[in-house]
Structures are given as C-alpha cells and as structure tokens.
Swiss-Prot record:
InterPro entries: APOBEC4 (IPR038953), CMP_dCMP_dom (IPR002125). Its EC number is 3.5.4.-. The gene is APOBEC4. Its cofactor is Zn(2+). Putative C to U editing enzyme whose physiological substrate is not yet known. It is an enzyme of class 3 (hydrolase). GO terms for biological process: mRNA processing. This is Putative C->U-editing enzyme APOBEC-4. It comes from Macaca fascicularis (Crab-eating macaque). Belongs to the cytidine and deoxycytidylate deaminase family. One of its GO terms (molecular function) is hydrolase activity. Keywords: Hydrolase, Metal-binding, mRNA processing, Zinc. Residues 61-177 form the CMP/dCMP-type deaminase domain. Zn(2+) binds at H93, C127, C134.
Amino acid sequence: MEPTYEEYLANHGTIVKPYYWLSFSLDCSNCPYHIRTGEEARVSLTEFCQIFGFPYGTTYPQTKHLTFYELKTSSGSLVQKGHASSCTGNYIHPESMLFEMNGYLDSAIYNNDSIRHIILYCNNSPCNEANHCCISKVYNFLITYPGITLSIYFSQLYHTEMDFPASAWNREALRSLASLWPRVVLSPISGGIWHSVLHSFVSGVSGSHVFQPILTGRALTDRYNAYEINAITGVKPFFTDVLLHTKRNPNTKAQMALESYPLNNAFPGQSFQMTSGIPPDLRAPVVFVLLPLRDLPPMHMGQDPNKPRNIIRHLNMPQMSFQETKDLERLPTRRSVETVEITERFASSKQAEEKTKKKKGKK
C-alpha cells in the first residue's frame, strides 16, 4: 500500500503528517503534525480540561476535536498510544485522519498483525457529516479488518441535538456503528476511565492528583451522555455509573449534592422534583463504584442484515440508592411495564389467597 502520511522521529515518540501534502498553516496551530505517538501524545492539563470539559462538565460547545488512542493486542498489552487533533485550517476531524484508507491506522495494523483492539478517547463523539464522513470511514475500516475490535469513549455528544441540520445523519450513523456490538462499544468517558486518560495522556499530572474524586458536575454530564447514547442507538452503553459508596466513604456532602441537584437540567425534557431548593456545589466530589473494564476478545464476524438494531445488554449493575431509583423510574424505560406485571401478579396471588380462605370458611 502507498501511505498518505509521513512520520518523523521525535524526542519521545513520533510526529505524523496524516496527509503528506499538508504544510504549516497560520489557520491551524497543529499543522502539519496532527498525529503524535508515544509520550509525544501528552497534552497539558490546561488544554485537556478546556477541550474535554474536565473536571466540571462541558459548559459550552467545543469546536476543537482531540482523540487519544491505544492500540492493544488480544491479551491487552499496549502496542502504541497516541493522539490525533483536528485541523481547523482544512476542517478535518481526528477520526477521519486516523481511519482514512491507506492512512496511519490502516498502515499500522497492516504491518503489525498483533494489534487486535483499538480504544479511542474522544472529546466529541464521531460524526458522519458530508464534509467528514468519520463514521463511514470507521465502518469501512472494520470491514477491511474483521479481526479488530473497537471501543469509543467520548466526553460529549457531537451534533446529535434535534435542532442541528445534520443530526439525523449523525444519529443514524451512530446507530449503524452501535449495531456491531459487541465488536464495537460506544460509551461516555466516566469514573475510572477519566483517571486512566489523565495518567496516560496528560503531562504534569502524577500520583494522587490522577485519582482525585470525579466532581458532581462532570459525573452528571457523564450520566446524561449514557442515557442519551442509549436513546439514540438502542444499545445500553458499557459505562461506569455514578453511585455513592456510603459504607466505605460516608461523604454526606457529596450525597446531598447529588440527590438535591435539579436533574431537569441534566436530563432535558424530563421533569424531576427537587429535594432541596438550593442547587449543590458542582465541585463536590462523587465516589464511584467501578465496573471492570475488560478488553473484548477479537471476533471474526460479519454484519448480519437481519440483526435487530435495538440490542439490550444485561449487566449486573451495583445496587442503587432509593433516590436514584425514584429518579430513574421517571425515565422512559421498560421498568413501568415490569412494575405493572409484578403488580398484576401480586393482585392475582392475593385473590387466590382470598378464595382459599372462603373455601376454608365454608368447610
């Protein structure tokens, strides 16, 4: 294959021109080296916080796109890490650069058959708008390499709101990509994944600073992203939920903050009743119960045209608090149907008991 990129050795890794015709541009601060590997992939804490909306949650629309990636073997060993940044001068997204035919990842996997799993950590979910076609390129890449599995973690959804002109394309493309589960995982960054990204890709952060508790504002944004991607794709995300572990860490301030937060701001279109009239400090820490993050084994499988799009995955989730259970029952899930069925069974059993008592009384 004739690659479209050029790679150069740097002090702590490599720097890559994803398209060999790119040159230095005054319109883009990252041109022409939009892909960086190894320790060259690290960014400053300030840049990371601004682009990923960490640690307080996304507060404004993000125009810059930054994607960290890891290439791993089937056993989970790291082959390479790196990042790809968007080109503001040529308006190119990171996923488009990485998954381009004859591009960097295409060449990397073609020349190293031990790579079996790709993990992306994106500030924006991939799109499929006409000028980018990111998801289409990812989809074609997976068809070319049927032994590769892919996990995509994002800090915010990109152009999926109904009032955006191209949202229908993006939502439909996300559904198509999610239908490849379990080969493809779409999930928000949350919990311990934040700590992993900080440790691997952010410079100047080490020790206890990496494992600081996730703040309430960021945690609520992650939870909203999880429900939203589920509503779009019909596939429950593989994510770490926000749950307070009061037994091991009785942080009453964090608990009160989470339970009294006006959830109608975190879940647009839903009506929630506040337990307190004062909004909490979104900087209050939240204690997480982490679900184990495992690398999926390589799967040699094709797309089944008869496979339904709506896939429900059953995970053993940690026990939820009473307040969280009340809030989630208001969401449009199947819980209400199950509740009705259980109530009907209970009523039927109660009637049966009354009939038995009447029969005994007649005797």
